[in-house]
From Swiss-Prot:
Disruption phenotype: Deletion of most of the operon (hyfBCDEFGHIJR) has no visible effect under fermentative growth conditions at pH 6.5 or 7.5, during aerobic or anaerobic glucose-limited growth at pH 6.5, or when combined with hyc mutations. Residues 1-5, 52-79, 141-164, 221-242, 294-311, 364-384, 449-474, 526-531 are periplasmic. GO terms for biological process: anaerobic electron transport chain; anaerobic respiration; ATP synthesis coupled electron transport; formate oxidation; glucose catabolic process. It comes from Escherichia coli (strain K12). This is Hydrogenase-4 component B. Possible component of hydrogenase 4. Induction: Most efficiently induced by formate during post-exponential growth at low external pH (pH 6.5) in the absence of respiratory electron acceptors O(2+), NO(3-) or trimethylamine-N-oxide, i.e. under anaerobic control. Transcription is activated by FhlA and HyfR, inhibited by HycA, part of the sigma-54 (rpoN) regulon. Second member of a 10 gene operon (hyfABCDEFGHIJ); it is not clear if the 2 following genes (hydR-focB) are also in the operon. GO terms for molecular function: NADH dehydrogenase (ubiquinone) activity.
Length: 672
């Protein structure tokens, strides 16, 4: 049985799980178990399919009798799609295991319907990766968007519905851009098959138009700036295992689409240099502003969603380098850029999935998203705390975890730009490196804040004081992802050549030197990555701080004493503990132009019960783009909708007239 046949069985299981959930409406507990177990098995088969295809190393193509003449049903599984299937299936397995007990919280609240939409969501993502026809690609892309939209609005409260509407608008705006790009290529090729697109040699102007349409269309799904506004609202609104899939793998469909169009469908046309520079620029801006806005958040899931914008930016940085390499016919830049992009795509799926599952575990016990109402959870939820600690270290690119490895390769790709003689790239490379360095520092600060405020210190609410560990299936799911974060880092010298082979096969570039003890990336001294030295670095860096800590502890043990914290003469209260607002305050001053601070008087906040005064604190920090651009657009759209609402008269005859008028306009347009 080949990889495509295995993948077909995986899709059948997802569809069976979705239909079974639909027929079990009202029997939520049974639907949760059936949906979770079936999708788990489907994910395992998907993993086997991806590994089988990567091991075989050949492109598989299957054609079926089309239901429409213009839309051939063709499946094509190459190295990139197999890699994406593997990444998605890994996270599906873990999230399915997690859902078996997590979804009990939604019993009686539409859990069976959520199982239906969840499995449709997974199936559409996986099928989209191997679809080789523009019509069916768009159909599956829309299925993915609509099913995830239903998951976003699952709670049916005002916040989730507002988030869902913004997501719906931006997702479909992106779909329209992608559709126009495919129609332009279809007009030139006379077919909607991707195979015909690959043979096109478009004019520079038309090729650039197609690329920009596809880039911003798929970029809206990826959550890159400036099309990111839906992401920090929609992802936190969904159930946590759905958030893990949306943030961990759904946004990567956007990255996949950008790679597919720019480096596959338009490869015959050729890539202008400015395409890669544009992708690098937007990636750098997304990375820096994404982590900066994450730092300002008090909502734990919104913080993680903003961090996804940051990591999408890092991936786009590496993708931009790869596109520059293709433009300059430089296989080193191309392969190293894709190595960094694909490695970080995999790693981000794992540690972001882990952190969203950890956030879901916390929220299920404390019933709040506000980190200021958490604290001291490491004592009460030790397994969750341990798993989240690994996730925070990984996402902060701290060795010896996987986030460090992929960001290291991204750095290598940027260093490799120094070999290029183009002045624009000699300027773009250092600027991107500075922005990536600042991003890395802010990311460490962000997740120190998240972990410290959430798991350390004193409990800041009754729910935090009474919190208990989550059930074993949720713990096992989180620990599996934590173990993968460590395992992938330690196997980097084995895994990197495999990913480089995927990059080579996808772009048809000459393979770089890959061997044990030999530089993974051939080039000058400062661009070389040696597996043995990298492994030594991974083992040594975490060991040195540990030795220093033991030395300091032995020296100070004799002089240490324990007592109450000094509170300036007042009795200690948990509200006096350091807060996320305090951590962020210096950055609010430095980057004040990028934030709009909202304050609200709260009479319930009193540091001392004997003081009946009103204290003020920042309730939210609104990003500049959302406040100055997105909010006015939304308001204008709402006003326009009210103005044209009279067209919805309820008169069926008038609606028929609208249809006839639209048909006449279309016929005139075609005739002209």
């Amino acid at each position: 049985m080949d990889a495509l046949q295995l993948l077909t069985w995986s899709l059948i299981l997802y569809l069976f799980a979705s239909l079974a959930s639909l027929f079990l409406l009202g029997l939520d507990r049974l639907a949760i178990k059936l949906s979770g177990i079936t999708s788990l098995v489907g994910g395992v088969i998907g993993i086997i399919s991806g590994i089988t295809q990567l091991h075989a190393g050949v492109t598989l193509v299957a054609r079926f009798a089309p239901p429409f003449e213009f839309a051939d049903l063709t499946l094509r599984m190459d190295s990139l799609s197999a890699f994406m299937v593997l990444v998605i299936s890994l996270l599906v397995v873990v999230c399915s295991l997690y859902s078996l007990t997590y979804m009990r919280e939604y019993e009686g609240k539409g859990a069976a319907a959520m199982g239906f939409f969840m499995n449709i969501f997974i199936a559409s993502m996986v099928a989209l990766l191997v679809m080789d026809n523009a019509f069916w690609f768009i159909v599956l892309f829309e299925m993915m968007s609509l099913s995830s939209w239903f998951l976003v609005i699952a709670r049916q409260d005002k916040t989730s519905i507002n988030a869902g509407m913004l997501y719906f608008f931006i997702a479909h705006a992106g779909s329209v851009l992608i559709m126009i790009a495919f129609l332009l290529m279809g007009r030139e090729s006379g077919s909607l098959d991707f195979a015909s697109f690959r043979t096109l040699s478009l004019s520079p102007g038309l090729a650039s138009a197609v690329f920009l349409l596809a880039f911003f269309g798929f970029g809206a799904k990826a959550g890159m700036m400036p099309l990111h506004s839906w992401l920090p609202r929609a992802h936190p609104a969904a159930p946590s295992h759905a958030s893990a899939l949306m943030s961990g793998v759904m946004v990567k469909i956007g990255i996949f689409g950008i790679l597919k169009v720019a480096m596959d469908l338009l490869a015959q046309t050729g890539l202008p240099l400015w395409w890669g520079i544009l992708v690098m620029a937007i990636g750098a801006i997304s990375a820096l502003l994404g982590v900066l806005y994450a730092l300002a958040e008090q909502d734990i899931k919104r913080l993680l969603a903003w961090s996804t914008v940051e990591n999408v930016g890092i991936i786009l940085l590496a993708v931009g380098v790869a596109m520059v390499g293709l433009s300059l016919h430089d296989p080193l830049l191309t392969v190293v850029g894709l190595l960094g992009a694909l490695f970080h795509l995999l790693n981000h799926a794992l540690f972001k999935g882990l952190l969203f599952l950890g956030a879901g575990a916390i929220i299920s016990r404390l019933h709040t998203h506000d980190m200021e109402k958490m604290g001291a959870l490491a004592k009460r939820m030790p397994w969750t705390a341990a798993a989240c600690l690994i996730g925070c270290l990984a996402i902060s690119a701290i060795p010896p975890l996987n986030g460090f490895i992929s960001e290291w390769y991204t750095w290598q790709s940027l260093f490799s730009l120094s070999r290029v003689e183009a002045v624009a790239l000699q300027l773009a490379g250092p600027i991107a490196m500075v922005m990536l360095a600042v991003t890395g520092g802010l990311a460490v600060m962000c997740f120190v804040k998240m972990y410290g405020i959430t798991f350390c210190g004193a409990p800041r609410s009754t729910h935090a004081e009474e919190a208990q560990e989550v059930p074993n299936t949720m713990i096992v799911a989180m620990l599996l992802l934590a173990a993968l974060c460590v395992l992938i880092a330690l196997s980097a010298s084995w895994l990197a050549p495999k990913i480089m082979h995927i990059a080579h096969a996808f772009t048809n570039t000459p393979p770089a030197t890959v061997a044990s003890g030999i530089a993974l990336v051939p080039g000058t001294f400062h661009t070389q990555v040696t597996p043995s030295l990298l492994l030594l670095l991974l083992l040594a860096m975490p060991l040195l701080p540990g030795l220093y800590w033991l030395w300091c502890r032995s020296r100070r043990a004799a002089f240490r004493r324990t007592g109450d914290a000094w509170a300036c003469g007042y009795g200690w209260e948990n509200a006096m503990a350091p807060s996320g607002n305090g951590v962020m305050q210096p950055l609010r001053v430095v980057f004040s132009a990028l934030f709009r601070l909202r304050q609200q008087l709260d009479p319930t906040l009193r540091l001392n019960k004997g003081l009946a005064h009103v204290t003020a604190r920042a309730q939210s920090t609104e990003p500049f783009w959302d406040e100055r651009v997105i909010r006015p657009i939304v308001s204008a759209t709402q006003r326009l909708a009210k103005e044209i609402q009279h067209l919805q008269s309820g008169d069926f005859r008038l609606y028929c007239l609208y249809v006839v008028a639209a048909l006449v306009v279309l016929l005139i347009a075609i005739a002209v």
